[in-house]
């Protein structure tokens, strides 16, 4: 042993006086040689216990303590349960080659399971490690270790891995298709029967805005509430406005398409041969003379004779 090797060395390495150089004036110091301890193999548990008892008695205060402070009470050693002695005996038994668990009366986990759990229950308390392993897998998304996999396989009665703590797992992100919701699914919706819709359409065709009295009568007749009848009329008017707006847009689009398809008409240019000369207007005297056949230039007299316009000389 290393300890015995140091003890068996020559004591000459610890001289009685310290050698010093001539330049330093140091007083000689005497060292006492260490006692010769027996070999380490000679120790026994009983000897170790006796040495510990002697050390405790040496450290315990005697009557030399002053009365002003009083002897300290070792209550901290008495605060432990009586099981401490059993633990010390178990340690001693383990040093001698035995098992400390056997000396203290503990049994193996298999014996404990055989004595205390003779029947197999489906809801076994040992499912807690599976829950803990599932929680650790949730917090740490890395690959599970072989120990956790083995524990999960042993806890499953059918041999398949099954996690008993599904409610502790983080829910997976749903797909985009499941996240899309329509407007009517999130709200309260009334499904009208064919007879109710027919009567409501008749009333809407008669009057787009229903009166309070007619609304109460129609609700009592169809088995609906007045609020439901009012909401149906509001939705029906909105639907009609939407339909009319769509029709107007379609008409405008058709007109635009027709204008783009047919080019605008171009003005026709006159041809040079088609132009004709316009006759000049005639005077009334010339027209009158031309209308009388064989007329002689002159003026008719009162007796019906013709007067010569020329003056005779």
From Swiss-Prot:
Main location: nucleus
Subcellular location: Nucleus
Tissue: Expressed in the intestine.
Residues of the DNA-binding region: 185-244
Post-translational events: Ubiquitinated, leading to its degradation by the proteasome. Phosphorylation at Ser-60 reduces transactivation capacity. Phosphorylation at Ser-283 reduces transactivation capacity and also increases ubiquitin-dependent proteasome degradation.
Bias (Basic residues): 114-124
Comp. bias (Low complexity): 249-261, 271-300
One Pfam family linked to the record: Caudal_act
Ranges for region Interaction with DNA: 185-215
Motif (4S motif): 283-295
GO CC, any one term: nucleoplasm
GO annotation (BP), single: anterior/posterior axis specification
InterPro entries: Caudal_activation_dom, Caudal_homeobox, HD, HD_metazoa, Homeobox_CS, Homeodomain-like_sf, HTH_motif
Region called Disordered, residue ranges: 113-153, 242-313
Identification of the protein by name: Homeobox protein CDX-2
Lineage of producing organism: Eukaryota, Metazoa, Chordata, Craniata, Vertebrata
